[in-house]
Design a protein with these regions (language model features):
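Short, intrinsically disordered N-terminal pre-domain segments
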Residues: 1-12
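Short acidic-hydrophobic surface loop/beta-edge motif
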Residues: 10-20
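Short, surface-exposed, charged amphipathic helix/loop patches that serve as local interaction elements
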Residues: 22-128
Length: 128
């Protein structure tokens, strides 16, 4: 079981990704966090070949590792729950990129919608 403090809970939203109501807990990343992820996703060892696909995959893995704080309803084929961890995010991307691609799409689209709404409210003074 993972415990979340009040600050994390306030900034985190549950995002349903699948028809069975399974999904993830995620938060909006700051521009600084996104910039850091962009730089890290472009950093390679000397023996690695840099490709746009690899940089994109690295960005998405790092984004999910930073934005997610947990998930509900994700199970292995035998029905046992998949434990949440940063390592598991990377491992799942390696073995089931379609699943993680769906999760990334849900998270990025939902959080960009929330961020746009927050920016609109802050410009109009609705949060004052």
């Amino acid at each position: 079981m993972k415990f979340v403090n009040d600050a994390t809970a306030k900034d985190t939203a549950f995002i349903k990704c699948f028809p069975d109501d399974s999904g993830v807990y995620a938060r909006i990343l700051t521009e600084t966090e996104l910039d850091t992820i962009r730089v890290k996703s472009r950093t390679f060892n000397g023996n690695e070949k840099r490709t746009p696909e690899l940089m994109d995959r690295r960005f998405k893995i790092l984004h999910l590792q930073r934005a997610l704080s947990g998930w509900e309803g994700l199970e292995f084929e035998d029905g046992s729950p998949i434990p949440f961890s940063k390592e598991m995010i990377k491992e799942l991307w390696e073995v089931n990129p379609n699943l993680m691609g769906i999760i990334y799409s849900c998270v990025s689209s939902e959080l960009s919608f929330v961020k746009a709404a927050e920016e609109k409210n802050s410009v109009t003074g609705a949060d004052a």
